[in-house]
Amino acid sequence: MLDSAKRLRRAWKRAHLRVREIRMIVKGLVSTDHPIDAHIIPMRRCNLACAYCNEYDDFSKPVPLDKMYQRLDHLAALGTAIVTISGGEPLLHPELDSIIARVRRHGMIAGMITNGYLLTADRIKRLNRAWLDHLQISIDNVMPDEVSKKSLKVLDKKLQLLGEHANFHVNINSVVGGGIHNPKDALAIGKRALELGFTSTVGIIHDGGGQLQPLRDEEREVYAAMRSMEKSSYARINYFQDNIAHGRENHWRCRAG
């Protein structure tokens, strides 16, 4: 059980983050002269090898901290609102906490996407001290299989640790498409996320060739059910996925003109 001091601390951080998110959304609507969300990869190496993923290797070294600082400073100079740290697996970078702290020092929202395998109580507390804003874990199935080891069975203890120790917002993203064998697993994952006090989203995953395909009937039903569970925030501005799910064309417009 969370003590009252921790609940108050989380509530304060949640309210403060919400104000910053609203400010970012308003700024993005008023002006198109700056990036909204920049993804940055400090570590391409990953500790897993999911069959559908082509965004990792097993040999790359961490990007040096001075180069990461240069890139983050430049993003700040451009007026970037959000920096999402991904990979590979960002928790493998030995200076990750300093990278997160640099993002926050510039007033940008600091998010991270991780597979969650390397989370411990101490690691979560270090992320708190670095002032991480958002953490997302993508869980692909209930039981691990040859496509993905990012399963609820393996990661549920990590989720419980996050529920106990994290002061930052946690979102659990489940997926359909891309060779995932049991689409209904996404519903079980989403319900578990809500039980633990997290938010839940669903994504359409690409196949091994990097291509997004329209969803099958069962996948569309699960996708619709999951979308109804999502809460409104800037991270849910993803209506383009509805078109992908139904095989409809998206009409993109570049914010830069």
List the predicted regions and their residue ranges.
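Radical SAM enzyme [4Fe-4S]-AdoMet core and its adjacent flexible, acidic
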Residues: M1, V63, I109, R129-H134, ...
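Conserved alpha-helical substructure of the radical SAM core
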Residues: L2-D3, R7-H134
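Cysteine-cluster motifs in flexible loop/terminal segments that predominantly coordinate metals
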Residues: A49, A256-G257
